[in-house]
Regions:
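Glycine-rich hexapeptide-repeat left-handed beta-helix
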Residues: 118-267
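Intrinsic-disorder/low-complexity regions
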Residues: 7, 17-18, 38, 61, ...
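Polar/charged alpha-helical tracts
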Residues: 11-12, 17-18, 30-33, 238, ...
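Intrinsic-disorder/low-complexity coil detector
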Residues: 24, 126, 293-294
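Flexible, glycine/small-residue-enriched loop-and-beta-strand segment within the central core
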Residues: 34-35, 39-164, 175, 180
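Extended, small-residue-rich solenoid/repeat segments and analogous flexible loops
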Residues: 1-60
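Intrinsic disorder/low-structure terminal segments
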Residues: 12, 34, 42-43, 57, ...
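C-terminal non-catalytic accessory extensions
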Residues: 250-307
Length: 307
């Protein structure tokens, strides 16, 4: 059995065997890293500060990658098992602890400049096996999760396996993403998450302490820096997923992440637009408009979705 190695402070890093720590966090307040496997890599970019953070490697050949820290210290509980990648981009802010569990060799990739509220969970798997009763084949395979750049995820949201979120999107409080494709510059809410507004963008300033003058000055913002579009620099989440799976060692995967994502500053790299999202919303509305006396709860639901 692989010996458990625990790092409660930076001084413990030199004692780690059969695993690799690259870089040093500037702080490790109430945090620790635990290794119960081998050939794992954890990377800390400059200015990464940890608070109430735990990273636990329960298996082999994983990569955990923390890019440069944001306004706040990183607060995260990350559990990885075998052959998975957890990547957090530059200048991401965690208001409180986010939780991520990675299983069955699948991954969680988070872009730059993301904002996370309270009580957020990321999972790329179902905990137990589910089978089709006729074919007797498994139907709940684990799937990677991708979050683009400048994504705001609200309180108690649950980002489930197979979810792909485009840059500039908003995931509302208590939303369950349901493994869906969430378009860039759209706002999503509900269970499962549905588009409630298209063609939006969001800014970081918090309105808590705003007075009348600040509210007035915030009413128009003409810079289009957070509006994303399709161009030749767009990356495919599916291609990234397949390439990470193709690479056999944690060293190869680390090099791929560094070159393809960490060193890539193209604005539109994680732009996502899935026409089916819009078509699904419109089809639900038109279908019910053609029905006689649709149930009240469905009518109200459709009204809420398009407001």
């Amino acid at each position: 059995m692989q010996q458990c190695q625990i790092c409660n402070c930076i001084e413990d890093f030199d004692l780690v065997e059969d695993n690799k720590i690259i870089g040093l966090p500037s702080e490790m307040q109430g945090s620790f890293i635990e290794f119960k496997g081998k050939n794992n890599i954890i990377f800390f970019d400059e200015s990464v500060a940890l608070e109430d953070t735990t990273v636990r490697f329960f298996g082999d050949n994983n990569v955990v990658f923390f890019s440069s820290g944001g306004r706040y210290k990183i607060r995260a509980k990350v559990d990885v098992f075998n052959n998975s990648v957890f990547y957090m981009g530059k200048n991401c802010d965690t208001t409180r602890v986010i939780r991520a569990v990675l299983s069955e060799g699948k991954h969680i990739i988070i872009g730059n400049d993301c904002l996370f509220s309270f009580g957020i969970w990321f999972r790329n798997y179902d905990p137990h096996l589910i089978y089709d009763g006729s074919s007797m084949e498994r139907i709940n395979m684990s799937k990677s999760v991708f979050v683009g750049d400048h994504v705001w995820i609200g309180q108690d949201a649950f980002v489930s396996k197979g979810t792909k979120i485009g840059s500039g999107a908003i995931v509302g409080a208590k939303c369950v993403t349901g493994g869906r494709i969430l378009n860039s510059n759209c706002s999503y809410a509900g269970v499962p998450g549905k588009a409630v507004r298209e063609n939006i963008f969001w800014l970081r300033p918090c309105v808590h302490s705003y007075k009348q003058a600040q509210t007035k000055s915030s009413m128009c913002y003409k810079n289009k820096e957070f509006i994303y579009s399709n161009d030749e620099n767009c990356l495919s989440f599916d291609t990234i997923d397949k390439e990470i799976d193709r690479l056999l060692s944690s060293e190869e995967r680390f090099d791929y992440l560094k070159k393809t994502i960490f060193e890539n500053d193209n604005k539109n790299r994680f732009y996502v637009h899935n026409e089916q999202t819009k078509l699904n919303l419109l089809s639900r509305i038109f279908r019910r408009n053609n029905e006689a006396s649709p149930p009240l709860i469905e009518t109200l639901s459709d009204f809420w979705l398009i407001c």
